[in-house]
Each structure stands twice: as C-alpha cells, then as structure tokens.
C-alpha cells in the first residue's frame, strides 16, 4: 500500500516536471523522462530497486545512467526441469498465461523451455 502510494506520487512528480523540458542530449541516449529522474529524483532508482529488485534489469535500456548507480541483480534462472515437468500441455499453459509464451516470451522459451515449445509448435 505504501509502495503503491509512493509510486503514484513519484509518477505525478515526474509528469508535472516534464513540462518545459527540452530534449535531453548526452553521450548516452536517454529519454527526457530519464534525465528528469536523474536531476530531480536521483534516489528514485534505489527506491525502485527496493520495491522491485529487478527494476534496473528490466528498465536499464530506457535509463542507463540512472541505473548504473544501482546494483543490477540478476534474475535467477528457472530450473529446466520445471518446464519439462509442469509445461507439457501447451493449450492449458497458453490459457493460463493468456498468450502463446513461446512467441511472446521467446527469449525465456528458447533458454528454458525448448522441449515445451516444440510441443507448442506442433499444434
């Protein structure tokens, strides 16, 4: 509840601060929102990492300068046997996720679910 309130407050501060800001130019290509985060809320990344440990890994490309100051924890890989044991029924899994994870999440599928996605591709 508290983290959601902080996130809403942070977003409203960022949006209100975007008025009047021109395009950001730097050696690292960043969006104006990223420059604003660095200038006005330099600790936002640290706070976001506390809320979501994978924040910098997930959003690094949009704000590299901000996230360089953060520790970038790696997501633990899923054990390969999990895919073999739990993901043998492609239609049921697609219904559970609401999408074809072999197409929508191809990087995950190619790393951990090769045998699972072979089943999907045959159907």
Swiss-Prot record:
It comes from the Eukaryota. The keyword Secreted applies. Its main location: secreted. Residues 1-17 form the signal peptide. Expressed in acontia, a specialised envenomation structure laden with batteries of venom-containing nematocysts found only in the superfamily Metridioidea. Contains 6 disulfide bonds. Keywords: Disulfide bond, Nematocyst, Secreted, Signal, Toxin. It is found in: Secreted; Nematocyst. The keyword Secreted applies. Transmembrane segments: none annotated. Cysteine-rich protein with probable toxin activity. This is Unknown 12C protein. It comes from Calliactis polypus.
């Amino acid at each position: 509840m508290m983290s959601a309130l902080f996130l809403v407050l942070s977003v409203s501060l960022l949006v209100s601060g975007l008025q009047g800001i021109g395009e950001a130019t730097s050696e690292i290509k960043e969006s104006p929102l990223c420059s604003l985060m660095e200038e006005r809320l330099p600790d936002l990344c640290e706070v976001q990492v506390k809320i979501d440990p994978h924040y910098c890994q997930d959003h690094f490309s949009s704000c590299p300068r901000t996230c360089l100051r953060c520790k970038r924890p790696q997501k633990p890989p899923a054990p390969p046997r999990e895919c073999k044991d739990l993901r043998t029924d492609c239609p049921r899994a697609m219904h559970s996720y609401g999408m074809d994870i072999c197409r929508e999440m191809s990087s995950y599928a190619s790393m951990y679910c090769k045998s699972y996605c072979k089943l999907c591709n045959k159907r």
